[in-house]
Amino acid sequence: MPEAAIDYLPLLAELQHRFHSSIPADLDVAIPTCGDWTATELVQHLADVHRWAAGMARGVNEWEEGPTEGFANYYEACARLLRETLAEVGPDAPAKTLVGPGPASFWHRRQVHETLIHLHDLRTPLALGLDGVPAEVWADGVEEVVSMFYPRQVTLGRTEPVPYPVEFVASDIGTRWQLGDGAPVATVTAPARELDLFLWGRIGLAHVTTAGDESKLAEALTRKLTP
């Protein structure tokens, strides 16, 4: 599946606004999908990532920890910095990416999906839900995992290749992806949203439909497909 025709920068701005608007007054709220993090760590993390990505879009790889208070304002500032940087340098500017030198447009897509997954993380324990994101956007997140993150994980030695080929099917839009070569031993089917969340470890097998060799599927899914 080729990269979707998504206008990433307006979508990024929308998702960042929703994230900022969802930051609770009580930052001690637990975020179960992020281990032992509270909202404090999640908000600071996404703000730090936005600031780092803005640097990467300019060809500078520098990571700095953010402040220890004023997290909502810090997030808003870092989100704005990222948007302004991406707009200023343009999509074709030479940048550093997660897979080597490439265009700054890499970060348009990457930060949309970074924000989307963490928006899910933030809103879920607050019982806010996450509606209004088109299936094609979630499907693009699946494509990013299959075509970029999984191969990168293997290249970096963070995981072994999947031992058996597995097919993923978005039941709402009919798109298919495959990890591994050859005829798939199993299929995982769900709406694109659930597939994306599943691949990022946000939901489990109870939220998808599987078919085929269950034992081989289970072994394949032990691989760490994302960071």
Regions found by a protein language model. Give the residues of each.
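Short, mixed-charge aromatic SLiMs
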Residues: 67-77, 134-152, 216-226
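Hydrophobic protein-protein interaction segments
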Residues: 132-181, 187-188
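Actinobacteria-biased recognition of intrinsically disordered, low-complexity terminal regions
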Residues: 1-13, 17-24, 221-227
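Hydrophobic packing residues in well-ordered alpha-helices of helical domains and bundles
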Residues: 5-12, 68-75, 108-115, 138
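Hydrophobic/aromatic-rich structural module bridging two neighboring secondary-structure elements via a short loop
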Residues: 55-109
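C-terminal interaction segments
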Residues: 184-227
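Short, contiguous alpha-helical
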Residues: 17, 24-61, 99-156, 195
